[in-house]
Amino acid sequence: MENNSFNWLQDWYYSQCDSEWEHSYGIQIETLDNPGWIIAIDLLETELEDREFQEISVKRSDNDWISCLVKNGKFQGAGGSLNLLEILDIFRKWVEAENSLKKES
């Protein structure tokens, strides 16, 4: 990806902040004890809240896996210890794909 996905996520979060959204919604990144990562990104009251997302589940090994879905108004991603950027890249590609479709319309 062209830019660092952490920087991109920071920019996406900032673009959602409107003096209201950030008081009820946000982004959570936590560790799992198996070990791994879990990410929850609130989509309610964003342009993404009604967008369809095709669930992704890949298990390469016990330590190299990802699972991403949208449920209850949240993008939810989980993965192994070294899969955090892969999860962020999946979210980013989904957002950017939707944005490019809007530009073409």
Where are these regions (language model features)?
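Conserved aromatic-histidine-acidic binding/catalytic patches
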Residues: 1, 29, 79
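Helix-rich interaction surfaces within compact, conserved domain-sized segments
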Residues: 56-104
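Amphipathic, interaction-prone secondary-structure segments
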Residues: 17-56
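Eukaryotic low-complexity, non-globular regulatory regions
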Residues: 3-6, 10-20, 83, 99-105
